[in-house]
């Protein structure tokens, strides 16, 4: 993957970001090239070793038209049954989807969370905080990627 200063990327654990600069950092006596990245959804900046980009699952941000096309599925299918036997299995499914770090995984997270929320509401049960957090994170990741793709900053 060919990245440079100004590239728009998606970092699985942090979300969408811009590569602000490339710099050399000495760590434990070893000098390495790093990308300094500005996150869309946080005031923090992170440094990522250039050599580890692919290992970390960092990928280029999709084009905004592609993102909009892909999220249209949520209009037709806002929820989907995760078919898990228990809540721990569901959390494991969420972890697997986070590892993929692609847009389709974020959409699937939203569908699963919507399904669980609706089912629990019908059953008169509380909605676990985990479901709300997963839903918020997936939505924020999609909105962040769309904003970075379009060159817009979130306020």
List each model region and its residues:
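A positional/architectural concept
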Residues: 1-56
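Charge/polar-rich, low-complexity and marginally structured segments
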Residues: 51-155
């Amino acid at each position: 993957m060919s990245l440079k200063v100004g590239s728009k990327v998606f970092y699985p654990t942090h979300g969408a970001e811009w590569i602000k600069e490339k710099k050399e950092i000495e760590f434990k006596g070893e000098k390495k090239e790093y990308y300094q990245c500005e996150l869309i959804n946080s005031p923090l900046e992170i440094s990522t070793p250039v050599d580890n980009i692919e290992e970390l699952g960092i990928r280029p941000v999709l084009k905004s038209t592609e993102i909009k096309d892909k999220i249209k599925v949520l209009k037709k299918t806002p929820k989907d049954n995760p078919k898990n036997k228990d809540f721990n299995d569901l959390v494991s499914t969420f972890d697997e989807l986070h590892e993929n770090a692609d847009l389709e995984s974020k959409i699937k997270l939203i569908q699963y969370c919507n399904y669980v929320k609706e089912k629990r509401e019908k059953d008169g049960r509380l909605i676990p905080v985990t479901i709300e957090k997963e839903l918020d994170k997936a939505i924020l990741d999609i909105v962040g990627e769309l904003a970075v793709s379009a060159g817009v900053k979130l306020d």
